[in-house]
């Protein structure tokens, strides 16, 4: 039995309503898509204030009011037509579009799947005018200068599409994410958000650093690096999060091109590559970056959502972004946004409130109290906090009076910059005094070692105050950079072992050692089979000669077996070198004398990106004299 041939249907043009609904399938994917399109229109109209009202996650209602230029009365019906816009009028303007919107299909697409009412007023109008999309009726209305777009009952006429919507909270989350992107891109615009009649978010117009802290929270604000780079027509600015601010998800990655939020694989790869020396594994960097370039150098007419772009010279853009972020991470050594930062409030300030010195002190005490489980002082914790929160603030001082009697480095060592090489190591019972760095802090920014704490940390003094160094993490970074430099130059020095280290190996490990012998030679290893079940390590890189040879060999063979020789050297090189450096770095409880500690500090100063270990953790932190004064409540 054969299936009946369906009757041929004639070719005919589709009705405008159906065309708009088809287009809406791409433009209006969910309530968040409506929010995005309306926010872009408001910003293109010059709005500086945005009021957003949502109901039931935006499914029942989305109303956005702006104070932009408004729409003239005679243009209101045209605004609801498909492909009607004031933003472009020729192909030349399309190729150099500088506005967020330009297609002229958003309002028509939204009106085809929801009940839309548009109310607008220009500065020349005596009153506002309203148009109802479903009927086309135009009538006078109340309202100030600007525009209100009220969208209700999304997908009321396409129930099949409505079934694909998620829960109210999920849709609300997507709407808020779009609003957050807008808030980060335009800190000069005040934004308020209400959901189901209750206030949800409010951001006053502010500087970029304050807006970023308000939107992304104090955790990111305390670990961000502000920077700005320019090269020719390219300019990149914003905030790159320190590796310590990395996250398990890529939910704090915001990249803007000419003010437009984009998701571009080229840009994401450039930023990720810049972090590869300090962030391995499954962690994602956090950042808010803005790229500016001539509009004609980027094509934004790639996808209906306008979230994808193409660059005229993609290679140049990639290299510029990569080097700019990499330089920012290298340049801000030691600025790890540690927990003693007091310039970022834990909660947003009330509108119009001005912080006083006493407020700053109280905030700092509250932050410290939240981190301390107990206080090693006589009075009870509650009484102490009550006393401190009611106390006066310390007066700022760049150099307290009590430091006037501290001898300088020149006086302490009769003009010598450091202790002689043949000086006897300091005894634990009476440690030698460390040279004090001069105020310029140029020669030795990490200062000079004073003591070792618990066999883990090196305590040093510099012109700013006190430096704490994690000696294992710091040594790990030094070894990593030396290994990386040697591998790039194909000059890894090899240390033959007087007695080869043998160990039982699996058939896979033995096969890997035989297959990737050339790669092992390049890495500085001599690993070969001495029996069907035994491998021997006869040489290791000189930099790693103190490490466990068996553990090193197993790690290298595991990576080679998993990824192959060429991929290990191309894509997994940094991870492999980080593992090797970790094996050979100085371990905890290794006692160092002052000469060894100072040698570590000098190596750190000469090493690129020495402020972060290979896993993204800080290698040192700076506590200024002002920080120490606050800890001991001096000057209050």
From Swiss-Prot:
Q: Where is the composition biased (Low complexity)?
A: 417-437
Q: Which CDD domains match?
A: HATPase_MutL-MLH-PMS-like, MutL_Trans_MutL
> Which stretches of sequence are listed as region Disordered?
332-360, 417-443
Q: Where is the composition biased (Basic and acidic residues)?
A: 332-344
Signal sequence, renumbered to the chain: none
Write out the entry's keywords from A to Z.
DNA damage, DNA repair
Please provide, alphabetically and separated by semicolons, the GO molecular function terms listed in this UniProt record. Answer: ATP binding; ATP hydrolysis activity; ATP-dependent DNA damage sensor activity; mismatched DNA binding
An example GO BP is: mismatch repair
State a GO cellular component annotated for this protein.
Answer: mismatch repair complex
Role description: This protein is involved in the repair of mismatches in DNA. It is required for dam-dependent methyl-directed DNA mismatch repair. May act as a 'molecular matchmaker', a protein that promotes the formation of a stable complex between two or more DNA-binding proteins in an ATP-dependent manner without itself being part of a final effector complex.
Q: Which HAMAP family match?
A: DNA_mis_repair (MF_00149)
Family listed: Belongs to the DNA mismatch repair MutL/HexB family.
Q: What protein name applies here?
A: DNA mismatch repair protein MutL
Organism classification: Bacteria, Pseudomonadati, Pseudomonadota, Betaproteobacteria, Burkholderiales
> Which gene does this sequence derive from?
mutL
């Amino acid at each position: 039995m054969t299936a009946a041939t369906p009757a041929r249907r004639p070719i005919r043009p589709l009705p405008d309503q159906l065309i708009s609904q088809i287009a809406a399938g791409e433009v209006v994917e969910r309530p968040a898509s409506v929010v995005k399109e309306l926010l872009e229109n408001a910003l293109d109209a010059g709005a500086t204030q945005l009021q957003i009202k949502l109901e039931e996650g935006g499914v029942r209602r989305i109303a956005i009011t702006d104070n932009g230029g408004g729409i003239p009365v005679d243009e209101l019906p045209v605004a609801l037509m498909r492909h009607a816009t004031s933003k472009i009028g020729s192909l030349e303007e399309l190729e150099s579009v500088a506005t967020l919107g330009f297609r002229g299909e958003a309002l028509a697409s939204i009106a085809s799947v929801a009940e839309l009412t548009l109310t607008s007023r220009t500065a020349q109008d005596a009153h506002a005018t309203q148009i109802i999309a479903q009927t086309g009726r135009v009538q006078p209305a109340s309202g100030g200068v600007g525009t209100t777009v009220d969208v209700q009952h999304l997908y009321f006429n396409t129930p099949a599409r409505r079934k694909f919507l998620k829960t109210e909270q999920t849709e609300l989350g997507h709407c808020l994410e779009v609003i957050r992107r807008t808030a980060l891109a335009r800190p000069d615009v005040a934004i308020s958000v209400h959901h189901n009649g209750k206030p949800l978010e409010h951001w006053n117009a502010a500087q970029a650093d304050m807006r970023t802290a308000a939107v992304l929270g104090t955790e990111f604000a305390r670990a961000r690096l502000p920077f700005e780079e320019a090269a020719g027509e390219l300019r990149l600015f914003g905030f790159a999060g320190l590796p310590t601010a990395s996250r398990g998800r890529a939910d704090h990655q915001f990249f803007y091109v000419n003010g437009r939020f984009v998701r571009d694989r080229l840009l994401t790869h450039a930023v990720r590559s810049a972090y590869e020396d300090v962030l391995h594994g499954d962690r994602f960097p956090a950042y808010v970056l803005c790229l500016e370039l001539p509009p004609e150098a980027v094509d934004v007419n790639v996808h209906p959502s306008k979230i994808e772009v193409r660059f005229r010279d993609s290679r140049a853009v990639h290299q510029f972004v990569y080097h700019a972020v990499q330089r920012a991470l290298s340049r801000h050594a030691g600025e790890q946004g540690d927990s003693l930062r007091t310039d970022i409030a834990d909660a947003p300030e009330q509108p119009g409130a001005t912080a006083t010195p006493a407020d700053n002190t109280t905030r700092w005490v509250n932050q410290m109290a939240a981190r301390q489980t107990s206080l090693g002082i006589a009075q009870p914790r509650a009484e102490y906090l009550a006393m401190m929160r009611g106390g006066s603030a310390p007066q700022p001082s760049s150099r307290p009076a009590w430091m006037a009697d501290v001898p300088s480095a020149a006086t302490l060592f009769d003009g010598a910059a450091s202790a002689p090489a043949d000086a006897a190591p300091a005894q634990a019972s009476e440690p030698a005094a460390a040279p004090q760095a001069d105020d310029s802090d140029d020669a030795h920014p990490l200062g000079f070692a004073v003591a070792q704490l618990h066999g883990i940390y090196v305590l040093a003094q510099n012109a700013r105050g006190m430096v704490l160094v994690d000696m294992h993490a710091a040594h790990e970074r030094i070894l990593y950079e030396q290994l990386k430099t040697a591998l790039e130059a194909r000059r890894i020095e090899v240390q033959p072992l007087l007695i080869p280290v043998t160990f039982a190996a699996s058939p896979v490990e033995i096969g890997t050692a035989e297959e990737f012998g050339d790669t092992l030679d390049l890495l500085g290893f001599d690993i070969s089979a001495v029996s069907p079940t035994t491998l021997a390590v006869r040489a290791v890189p000189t930099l790693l000669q103190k490490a466990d040879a068996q553990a090193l060999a197993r790690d290298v063979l595991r990576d080679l077996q998993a990824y192959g020789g060429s991929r290990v050297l191309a894509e997994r090189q940094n991870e492999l070198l980080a593992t090797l450096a970790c094996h050979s770095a100085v371990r905890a409880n290794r006692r160092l004398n002052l000469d060894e500690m100072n040698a570590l500090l000098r190596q750190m100063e000469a090493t690129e990106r020495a402020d972060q270990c290979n896993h993204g953790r800080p290698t040192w932190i700076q506590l200024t004299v002002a920080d120490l004064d606050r800890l001991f409540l001096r000057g209050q």
